[in-house]
Amino acid sequence: MSRFLICSFALVLLYPAGIDMYLVGLPRIAADLNASEAQLHIAFSVYLAGMAAAMLFAGKVADRSGRKPVAIPGAALFIIASVFCSLAETSTLFLAGRFLQGLGAGCCYVVAFAILRDTLDDRRRAKVLSLLNGITCIIPVLAPVLGHLIMLKFPWQSLFWAMAMMGIAVLMLSLFILKETRPAAPAASDKPRENSESLLNRFFLSRVVITTLSVSVILTFVNTSPVLLMEIMGFERGEYATIMALTAGVSMTVSFSTPFALGIFKPRTLMITSQVLFLAAGITLAVSPSHAVSLFGITLICAGFSVGFGVAMSQALGPFSLRAGVASSTLGIAQVCGSSLWIWLAAVVGIGAWNMLIGILIACSIVSLLLIMFVAPGRPVAAHEEIHHHA
């Protein structure tokens, strides 16, 4: 079992590493490519677009051909794209490389969740996804630090060579450690069950909405945090970095505590707790009389996301024993596109950073609480329906 956990964690971590590691080198990249930093900030959106594009096909291919045939090309593409970015001499080529990086990371991301669905029952999967969420929270803190240390002695291109090395590690794991987990093609008697795993299932759709809104909350916070903390609240850059590190610490602590909480409380209780924390955060930020209270509200956001997201993702994947790849892709596409659409629309309409965050917090909590209360899960997957990996 440990081989699947290690491989899944490695496959997922390419995604945040590809986002955060290069940011520290952005000024030098812009100078060398004769582009403004503002022009290169679109590299974040281009990377997410590549991930979304990969998710359109990766899940279906993973369900038909297997997890390894998607993970291996995905890791290889991430390596090639990282090298391509390091060799880019224009901003156009650099952005093209970032898109290809997103394609590779998206393939690996989809496969990771499909593997966890294949190999873990509902309760263990919820615990592992909570742990994975905690580990993912470490990357935005550690990746820029690692990038800074690399750039003390090496040029910015070395950041992408470091990413390529990460991709090589994932490729080696996928080639030599990971075993295929896709279930065998269903027999004729299993066809009705395969057909019953519909993406239009009310319970699955409710979890798609909940996880998409939750991701929208956390990405809105990350996207608006420089404005909120430095421009509105007046913190210096060093203080901003410290606050963000502390919020990551809160996220990690809660994420690593959630598996223990699942041994005491029902998953539904933790999901309700998550949304109540979001609602409390929105109200706190709306009526906050001081910076200290506002910072407390921000910690509630991090705690709320960490306590509920892994559980919601596990519930979303639960009904899909034969179509885990497609379900994982659907979740990823909805989360990436939904959160990006909200941030874009809010910017177009002219909603300020503070109100943007408060609005999504309150909307997420109200909608999600209603869905949790009134959309019950279908029958649990029986033990004989659990998918076992190939020997």
UniProtKB/Swiss-Prot annotation:
Q: Which InterPro entries match?
A: MFS (IPR011701), MFS_dom (IPR020846), MFS_Efflux_Transporters (IPR050189), MFS_trans_sf (IPR036259), Multidrug-R_MdtL (IPR023697)
Listed transmembrane segments: 4-24, 42-62, 69-89, 93-113, 131-151, 158-178, 203-222, 245-265, 269-289, 293-313, 331-351, 356-376
One Gene Ontology term of the molecular function aspect: transmembrane transporter activity
Q: Which residues lie on this side of the membrane: Periplasmic?
A: 25-41, 90-92, 152-157, 223-244, 290-292, 352-355
Location relative to the cell: Cell inner membrane
GO terms classed as biological process: response to antibiotic; xenobiotic detoxification by transmembrane export across the plasma membrane
Q: Which UniProt keywords apply?
A: Antibiotic resistance, Cell inner membrane, Cell membrane, Membrane, Transmembrane, Transmembrane helix, Transport
Topological domain (Cytoplasmic) residues are: 1-3, 63-68, 114-130, 179-202, 266-268, 314-330, 377-391
Q: Which Pfam families match?
A: MFS_1 (PF07690)
Carries keyword Transmembrane? yes
Give any Gene Ontology cellular component: plasma membrane
Membrane topology label: Multi-pass membrane protein
Q: What does this protein do?
A: Confers resistance to chloramphenicol.
What family is this protein classified in? Answer: Belongs to the major facilitator superfamily. DHA1 family. MdtL (TC 2.A.1.2.22) subfamily.
What protein name is recorded for this chain?
Answer: Multidrug resistance protein MdtL
Biological source species: Escherichia coli (strain K12)
Q: Which gene encodes it?
A: mdtL
